[in-house]
Amino acid sequence: MVKALMVQGTASDAGKSIIAAGLCRIFKQDGLEVVPFKSQNMALNSFITKKGDEMGRAQVVQAEAAGKEPDVRMNPVLLKPTSDRKSQVVFLGRVLRDMDAVEYHEYKQQLLPKIKEVYDELGAENDIIVIEGAGSPAEINLNDRDIVNMGMAKLVDAPVILVADIDKGGVFASIYGTIELMPPEDRKRIKGVIINKFRGDVALLQSGIDMIEELTQVPVIGVVPYAQLDIDSEDSVALVQKSRRFDSRKSLDIAVVSLKRLSNFTDFHSLEIQPDVSVRYVQPGDAIGRPDLLILPGSKNTIEDMNYLCESGLEAEILECLEQGVRIFGICGGYQLLGQKISDPLHLESDLEETRGLGILETETVLQPVKRTTQVRALHEGQELEGYEIHMGETQLADRLEPFSIIKEQNGEATERPDGAVAYGGQVQGTYLHGVFDNLEWTRQYLNELRLAKGLEPLEDQLVSIKDFKDREYDKLADVLRQSLDMEQIYQIINREEK
């Protein structure tokens, strides 16, 4: 039977995902075949596998840390909020339907047999599975039908480590409260506690650690410092923490419009790590100003976000940027927003039949019930690009518009179809390709065009590979965890040797 270790947290954003990723990296470094698993994830940032399956980004990060190709079995259930009340339910990479919280709470138990089946498949292929929970295991109003915290731990008989965030304050109360709210059989599964995001002298914590160990009878197996790491996050909390101001030490100012239903903000990580680029996220009340590049990102609800742009005043600022000659780039939902009209005849996103777009591109989009999920290779001005598509709309271009690229391969099969649009002599571009800025040479060429436009010399040898960058960050994360966790005790927990 495969060995397992489950990482749960006292709350959302306690650091479960990053701790799980770091453990995956450590086990890989130690020569073990390790794979991540999260039965149910809620996020707007998603990824398309080579087979065309949609999954959560956190498990993609963990898979990369483990040295494994992302596989939808690592995240069988993905919930993508479409409004404040509903989420799109994606199961094993494919859309089931939209459900509200009550409907999904009643339905999700039906998914357990298949969740267990794919877990067992991963177990047959690996030495260790690192399982991540969601939110808190002490949500006592939801525990009767839980499939992602203690419900999952019981399903596969996994020992649990509890992660608590000290940065927000009240860490000992959160540890004690979480454990005390559990029924006795669940408490027995908690084999260790990790205090995460600590700043200062660990010695000052010792008396509190001694007391919480006495109260809970659970050992604290590590205190992890607040580390300066740059690792993809799928949590909307991370977006709130991103910069809203231009870093004057950088040459290029790139502004990303923070849509209300913004999705896949990981598209811009490759830009954030470039030495000459400052990426800022514009929210209502912030001035867009005159950036070197304005980006409209992906959206899970383009109709709602068009209304948001109008009501917030951002629409007027975007159109002013167009008049000032600012380069504008739309990705997926952002590309749809640049068009003249978005139609929703089946009411997939709202009660409206249609809404106008920004009217910058001569395009019209019709939302459709079947989601396109593909990994693609495309040609843009003779240059090969790689990316992935996640969208439910089909966009028609006016005859005089040129496409941004030609898709040559999707999910490993040859094809030929246009993608995106280019207008205003290249000033405005739109594409359905997520991850387009991960294409290193094309991105540097694009950034150099922005540099030349403002009288700066191009950078020729400043190529920062997102893959190499990520690998360095995963190794740094593993180093931090090795220095701050009792790895001997963690291995004892995994091997059921704990005292």
Curated annotation (Swiss-Prot):
Q: Does the keyword Signal apply?
A: no
A Gene Ontology biological process noted in the UniProt record is: cobalamin biosynthetic process
Q: Where is the signal peptide?
A: none
User: Which keywords fit this entry according to its UniProt record?
Assistant: Cobalamin biosynthesis, Glutamine amidotransferase
**Role according to the record:** Catalyzes amidations at positions B, D, E, and G on adenosylcobyrinic A,C-diamide. NH(2) groups are provided by glutamine, and one molecule of ATP is hydrogenolyzed for each amidation.
Family per similarity comment:
Belongs to the CobB/CobQ family. CobQ subfamily.
* NCBIfam families (alphabetical): cobQ, PRK00784.1
For this entry, the protein name equals Cobyric acid synthase
State which gene encodes it. Answer: cobQ
